[in-house]
């Protein structure tokens, strides 16, 4: 509830900031015309929290979807590109499967292949590790790091997974109650003397985020009526 996903929607232009600016290459996203916003989004790849695959389309058609919608590439070229993208995430050979036939980790990797279909300059990851088993989580973290280096893209990742996130990112922005409480390198974050950051990094049950909800009455008052 600190505004992480909202921030991503500001970057994509789905929301307009009431105050301040979101600048991409020095240009205010909120000031884009419809044509500029279309081109801005065309340069982006977004990996949604649960993959968001089209359930009625095969794996092949899911990955091919942005190519067919946003380019005029011939089908033969699209076929080769789909195979290359699936190979990049280790899933060449599953083209004919439906999303319902995939495990959770495989579905997330197919979604990642679709995300990189057009070699985006900006990558947005919304909770990419949510709901994954340890092996799938490690695979996705490895792929995110490798793809980012291969594409040389700017990547923004929203995540609660401290261990995996700090292992692959260059800069951390820590949000609490809609405000930035820390911005710096992973190493600086680990050494920071901040109650907010310390509780989050170490998973402590009590701290600035209290264990108990601030009830208006005492327990004794509730029990005695």
Which residues does each predicted region cover?
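Helix-to-loop junction immediately C-terminal to a conserved catalytic motif
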Residues: 12
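Conserved ABC ATPase "signature" region
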Residues: 27-28, 75-93
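ABC ATPase NBD coupling module
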Residues: 29-45, 75, 189-192
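Conserved ABC ATPase signature
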Residues: 98-102, 106
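Conserved catalytic motifs of ABC-family nucleotide-binding domains
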Residues: 119
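Catalytic Walker B motif of ABC-type/P-loop ATPase nucleotide-binding domains
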Residues: 123-126
